[in-house]
Curated annotation (Swiss-Prot):
<dbReference type="InterPro" id="IPR035506">
    <property type="entry name" value="Pollen_allergen/Os"/>
</dbReference>
<keyword id="KW-0732">Signal</keyword>
<keyword id="KW-0020">Allergen</keyword>
<comment type="similarity">
    <text>Belongs to the Poa p IX/Phl p VI allergen family.</text>
</comment>
<protein>
    <recommendedName>
        <fullName>Major pollen allergen Pha a 5.3</fullName>
    </recommendedName>
</protein>
<dbReference type="Pfam" id="PF01620">
    <property type="entry name" value="Pollen_allerg_2"/>
</dbReference>
<feature type="signal peptide">
    <location>
        <begin position="1"/>
        <end position="25"/>
    </location>
</feature>
<dbReference type="InterPro" id="IPR002914">
    <property type="entry name" value="Poa_pIX/Phl_pVI"/>
</dbReference>
Length: 294
């Protein structure tokens, strides 16, 4: 039952860009509730929209499914549950390949740590898609809501990785510009959003961001995802969205390559002579260049 619920949830996450929010919000609660052991729920107050709640549920499922599996079998457990699923005859070959790329490039000294790194990358990719939907959702002016500072702070707290993985907070920042984008001419809406998105990346991560290999892929994925929101034929919407999600996931693997931690061998304490005689032990300075923690 749990497999069914969260496999459906994954494809509902795909629908975040491929279809209107109203169509999947009602479906999100239809699958049976999993039996014990229960999936840990999202922290109270963190999820503020249907999209965010769905992503939190997916994230919890990623961590819960393989929890009881031996470390070496965690990815295999995930792959069986997700990659081999076939919902409504949808082809997932592109996503299957992306999963493999991310897992193979995931950093981790042990199979379990490697899987945790994989979960991080895939979760951030999904958050990008959810954030993209919120930015591009076109609402009547009377229904347009500007995210409050409280919501933006909650989005920021939900990302605890290194700066290269705080994509959720980066995507959340341009949400405040969605009103301006929606008030722009129809042909200029994405241009307005794209400018806000790129500006947020540079402001949050600084100049070195431009040298990260994953940034071009990430920006391409956002454009691809946006294309799915304007496609008319359902089969075209899904195909374009799958391509966008695949690029987003692959971009996360590029980020992992850049952000691999630098592990330094511990240095022995230094013994320095004092002017009045004797000695003082000074601990070696630690290097702060390490990457994110898995």
């Amino acid at each position: 039952m749990a497999v069914q619920k969260y496999t459906v949830a994954l494809f509902l996450a795909m629908a975040l860009v491929a279809g209107p929010a109203a169509s999947y919000a009602a479906d999100a609660g239809t699958p049976p509730t999993p039996a014990t052991p229960a999936v840990p729920g999202a922290a109270a107050g963190k999820a503020t929209t249907h999209e965010q709640k769905l992503i939190e549920d997916i994230n919890a499922a990623f961590k819960w499914w393989p929890a009881s599996a031996p470390p070496a079998d965690k990815y295999k457990t995930f792959e069986t549950a997700f990659s081999k699923a076939n919902i409504a005859g949808a082809s997932t070959k592109g996503l299957d390949a992306a999963y493999s790329v991310v897992y193979n490039t995931a950093a981790g000294a042990t199979p379990e740590a490697k899987y945790d790194s994989f979960v991080t990358a895939l979760t951030e990719a999904l958050r990008i898609m959810a954030g993209t939907l919120e930015v591009h959702a076109v609402k009547p002016a009377t229904e347009e809501e500007v995210p409050s500072a409280k919501i933006l702070r909650a989005n920021s707290r939900s990302s605890t990785r290194s700066s290269r993985f705080k994509i959720a907070a980066t995507v959340a920042t341009p949400l405040s510009h969605s009103t301006a984008a929606n008030s722009a001419p129809a042909n200029d809406k994405f241009t307005v959003f794209e400018g806000a998105f790129n500006k947020a990346i540079k402001e949050r991560h600084g100049g070195p961001t431009e040298t990260y290999k994953f940034i071009p892929s990430l920006e391409a994925a956002v454009k691809q995802a946006y294309g799915a929101t304007v496609a008319r034929a359902p089969e075209v919407k899904y195909a374009v969205f799958e391509a966008g999600l695949t690029k987003a996931i692959t971009a996360m693997s590029e980020a992992q390559k850049v952000a691999k931690p630098v592990r330094l061998s511990p240095q022995p304490p230094q013994v320095l002579p004092l002017a009045a005689g004797g000695a003082a032990t000074v601990a070696a300075a630690s290097d702060s260049r390490g990457g994110y923690k898995v």
